[in-house]
Amino acid sequence: MATQAHSLSYAGCNFLRQRLVLSTLSGRPVKIRRIRARDDNPGLRDFEASFIRLLDKITNGSRIEINQTGTTLYYQPGLLYGGSVEHDCSVLRGIGYYLEALLCLAPFMKHPLKIVLRGVTNDQVDPSVDVLKATALPLLKQFGIDGESFELKILRRGMPPGGGGEVLFSCPVRKVLKPVQLTDPGKIKRIRGMAYSVRVSPQMANRIVDSARSILNKFIPDIYIYTDHMKGVSSGKSPGFGLSLVAETTNGTFLSAELASNPQGQGAAVLPEDLGRNCAKLLLEEIYRGGCVDSTNQSLVLLLMTLGQQDVSKVLLGPLSPYTIEFLRHLKSFFQVMFKVETKPCGEELKGGDKVLMTCVGIGFSNLSKTLK
């Protein structure tokens, strides 16, 4: 493992997940100072501490030092071990917060990862498990991460503030990743969705579907929105409802949008009709931004391109989010990889907004944790 001399130093609580995930993959220790040092409630939050505990569970030999106030963190990564794991996520953030990091790390374990995560499956902050299942899994398949043991399953739904959801994620390991050329997103051919309701009337989901279809039917006939009403113990601990929509293109690109109702006891009550209409509009905005990967998974695709074989990978993205821009800076710090960024102004009227073509040469990252069979 890298010594203290090669460690990277950062300040502040922003992008904590990015730094810890890239540290784990590159083997370079990180020291993060001044984590909310001037806040009334200084130091790491519960959900960040839970994330660090999760990293500790899936690695072997990690060294984690946190000072008394929780404002300084030193993390020396161990080997990614994998295997069967269970983890109770903090209900302050969705399971998507933890799952996004696991999607980056899972292909590089020593043993295939099989993990049960408990907590909030759908909230208003993090990508829901439904969206990650519909968009991130097909994306990983493009890089050659595929197989029977590759699945993401919602066993129970949990809405904030109580949580009570349960998700099973299993992923095979790969020695190397294939380079990709994702430059033509294609045209939208179908829209699929999931309207869910827990601990409220099942009619809520049907009302969401009708209002979402009222907008989307003007553009395309092939729309199917499933309704999912979980009962009893499968419905978690709090009431709520929401909608996730995914548009699929002729070239196998998936673009997503989602909305969830306000948590119980917080904010004004949301009408299912408004939620359905607003979510449909968000999907249309995402389609306008376009690209071969939606804005939720921009950083995931850039990471997998970086870690690919020593060959050129290209991907066409919509406008880069601030999170992705910071991620590119971190990729340069941890892996010394720079992307060629070309703006592609939109010439045609009906092709949406301006695009960005990202090109890089993979570092030929080899999964050292995986044992030779």
UniProtKB/Swiss-Prot annotation:
> What compartments host this protein?
Nucleus, Nucleolus
* InterPro entries, per database record: RNA3'-term_phos_cycl_insert (IPR013791), RNA3'_phos_cyclase_dom (IPR023797), RNA3'_phos_cyclase_dom_sf (IPR037136), RNA3'_term_phos_cyc (IPR000228), RNA3'_term_phos_cyc_type_2 (IPR016443), RNA3'_term_phos_cycl-like_CS (IPR020719), RNA3'P_cycl/enolpyr_Trfase_a/b (IPR013792), RPTC_insert (IPR036553)
GO terms under biological process: endonucleolytic cleavage in 5'-ETS of tricistronic rRNA transcript (SSU-rRNA, 5.8S rRNA, LSU-rRNA); endonucleolytic cleavage in ITS1 to separate SSU-rRNA from 5.8S rRNA and LSU-rRNA from tricistronic rRNA transcript (SSU-rRNA, 5.8S rRNA, LSU-rRNA); ribosomal small subunit biogenesis; rRNA processing
- CDD domains, per this entry? RNA_Cyclase_Class_I
Q: Name one GO molecular function term.
A: catalytic activity
Q: What is this protein called?
A: RNA 3'-terminal phosphate cyclase-like protein
Q: Which PROSITE patterns match?
A: RTC
Q: Which PANTHER family match?
A: RNA 3' TERMINAL PHOSPHATE CYCLASE (PTHR11096), RNA 3'-TERMINAL PHOSPHATE CYCLASE-LIKE PROTEIN (PTHR11096:SF1)
The UniProt entry, under Pfam families, shows: RTC (PF01137), RTC_insert (PF05189)
This protein's GO cellular component annotations are: nucleolus; small-subunit processome
What is the similarity comment for this entry?
Belongs to the RNA 3'-terminal cyclase family. Type 2 subfamily.
Fill in the subunit field for this protein: Part of the small subunit (SSU) processome, composed of more than 70 proteins and the RNA chaperone small nucleolar RNA (snoRNA) U3. Interacts with BMS1.
Task performed by this protein: As part of the small subunit (SSU) processome, it plays a role in 40S-ribosomal-subunit biogenesis in the early pre-rRNA processing steps at sites A0, A1 and A2 that are required for proper maturation of the 18S RNA. Activates BMS1 by promoting GDP/GTP exchange. Does not have cyclase activity.
Organism of provenance: Mus musculus (Mouse)
Q: According to the UniProt record, which cysteines are disulfide-bonded?
A: none
UniProt keyword terms in alphabetical order? Nucleus, Ribosome biogenesis
